[in-house]
UniProtKB/Swiss-Prot annotation:
Modified residues (FMN phosphoryl threonine): 186
Name of the featured protein: Ion-translocating oxidoreductase complex subunit D
Catalytic activity, EC: 7.-.-.-
Main location (coarse class): membrane
InterPro entries attached to this UniProt entry: NqrB/RnfD, RnfD_bac
Superkingdom in the source lineage: Bacteria
Description of how the protein assembles with itself and partners: The complex is composed of six subunits: RnfA, RnfB, RnfC, RnfD, RnfE and RnfG.
Gene field: rnfD
Species of provenance: Haemophilus ducreyi (strain 35000HP / ATCC 700724)
Length: 348
């Protein structure tokens, strides 16, 4: 028997796998930029993450008596693996991304019932778990390669990830020993801990900054921005979430900068020195864990911008995107409940 469904009975060509494939394509420019400025470690992390995704999806399919490729065909696991691999430090130990993929796919996705059922963004659940559980490994970012006397080769990247040392016996921390002014994980970390003493002008004179922008991070964020605009053009994502998120964050940051007189990085530095563009276009726009109503998307995006601002400026973690997205995910059922569009023909 056929299941009765309401009309119109039209076939949509935009399958889940097609949407996911466009997201992957949109992340390729940022992946290339990350390799160029931060090395080939991200390629190895991505390979590990993809391998784990394939294994986990096959195991879960078998446990649920599905076909082997049942959970692989939609490419959702591939997108999660790509986001997580690009979010963690390129030279983090191999077991970090392996644990992260287990948390992302098993705990944050399949324990909720699989694709379309999860309350939280799986990649951000894994990232937050890793950051809390392994803070040293998750803050082991190397600066842009132009600051390193001997940038790690692919062989060195492999050895750093699997053995913790390069072919010359250097750890990732030792690779920084010849660079003055670098004592923290990322430009946002460095600025947060030193701006009170050095001031804004002193911070941007650090080697990790080129003008008001962090070396490598500006190009990476521009690549994510380009990919996000491509997704908007292809109508894979909606404009409300990234626009609301960036506008709210920018306005609050600008007002704070006016009031506190350069005790924080300025708005442009904040937008292009961390994961803001990555979060706005590729993380916050997750179609499952984000709001689904037009007004709800604006509220959801604005809430992420507000939370990211509060955590960055007044919290202990300088980037804040993961925690802001997860906290906003908690509010999605409430947001959707109160922002349902009025049915045609009904009274306001």
């Amino acid at each position: 028997m056929f299941k009765m469904v309401s009309s119109p009975h039209t076939h949509g060509t935009n399958l889940t796998a097609k949407f996911m494939l466009w997201v992957i394509v949109a992340m390729l420019p940022a992946l290339i930029v990350q390799i160029a400025f931060f090395g080939t470690g991200v390629v190895i992390q991505l390979a590990i993450a993809l391998s784990m995704a394939i294994v986990i999806e096959i195991v879960v399919a078998k446990l649920r008596h599905k076909s082997t490729t049942f959970y692989l065909a939609d490419l959702a696991g591939v997108v999660t693996a790509t986001i997580l691999a690009m979010a963690i430090p390129p030279y983090a130990p191999y077991w970090v991304v392996m644990i992260g993929m287990i948390v992302a796919l098993l705990l944050a996705k399949h324990c909720y019932g699989g694709l379309g059922q999860n309350l939280f963004n799986p990649a951000m659940v894994a990232y937050a778990f890793l950051l809390i559980s392994f803070p040293v490994q998750m803050t082991s970012w190397l600066p842009s390669f132009e600051l390193l006397a001997e940038p790690p080769t692919f062989k060195d990247a492999w050895l750093l990830i699997f053995k913790g040392v390069t072919s010359d016996g250097f750890t990732s921390r030792q690779l920084l020993s010849g660079i003055d002014g670098i004592a923290q994980a990322t430009p946002l970390d460095s600025a947060k801990t030193s701006i009170a003493k050095l001031g804004f002008d002193g911070v941007i004179q650090s080697p990790i900054f080129s003008g008001i922008f962090a070396r490598g991070w500006l190009q990476l964020n521009l690549a994510f921005l380009a990919g996000g605009l491509f997704l908007l053009y292809k109508r894979i994502i909606h404009w409300q979430i990234p626009v609301a998120m960036l506008v709210v964050f920018s306005v609050l940051s600008a007002l704070t900068d006016l009031v506190t007189m350069h005790t924080h990085l300025n708005v442009l530095s904040q937008l292009f020195s961390g994961a803001m563009m990555f979060g706005a276009f590729f993380i916050a726009t997750d179609p499952v864990s984000a709001s689904i109503t037009p007004k709800g998307k604006l509220i959801f995006g604005g809430l992420i911008g507000l939370l990211a601002y509060l955590i960055r400026y007044y919290g202990s973690y300088p980037d804040a995107i993961a925690f802001a997205v997860l906290l906003a995910n908690l509010c999605v059922p409430l947001i959707d409940h109160y922002t349902q569009p009025r049915l045609y023909g009904t009274h306001k």
